[in-house]
Amino acid sequence: MLPKKKLLLIDLDETLIHTEFRTKENYKELEHFVKTSKCYVKTFSFSDDNCIYFMDVFFRPYLKMFLQEISKYFDLAIFTAAMKNYADTILDYIDPNNEYFQFRLYRDACIPIQNKLYIKDLRIIKDYDPSNVILMDNSLYSFMNQPSNGMLVNSFYTNNNDIQLINAKSFLIDHIYPCEDVRKECEKWYHFSKLFYKGTSKEKEETN
């Protein structure tokens, strides 16, 4: 029997955090920036293909509050188009004791399309009914296969005054948590199905 509690899938980059990779060219500029940014958390390192990368990570304002509060109402999981070793470096810091996220999905669970964009097909989720699954992401393309399950947020790029997670928390608790079917509620607010349908129809007309 499928669980009744709703599942909130959350994107990582530009939804919860922003990352700047350090290079010889931008090192001094980033050093100055991290000293003045309230969102800066830590400089992480991870290895990939025998190379070591250093990255400055910025948390979206109210990140901890958002996870603490929203986890009382939803099951949470990460669905990111990032590579596993990169994502886990940051997620292990955000959630070291696995308090918040039930599981993590990475790039290998996504469908690549053009220009480094990815679709996040929710058919990969087997333990929840589609009416109880919502994907919170800053990329509209992520919702392409199930637009009615999408919740779009603005991209985060180190803005100290960002309040998107406060707004997201209110929307999720007030509108998504009590609803019978997240798809009907999301369509009422976002109309993504109509948007994608129009885009598909236009492409067909242009190719005929």
Region spans (language model):
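Asp-based phosphoryl-transfer active-site loop
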Residues: 4-21
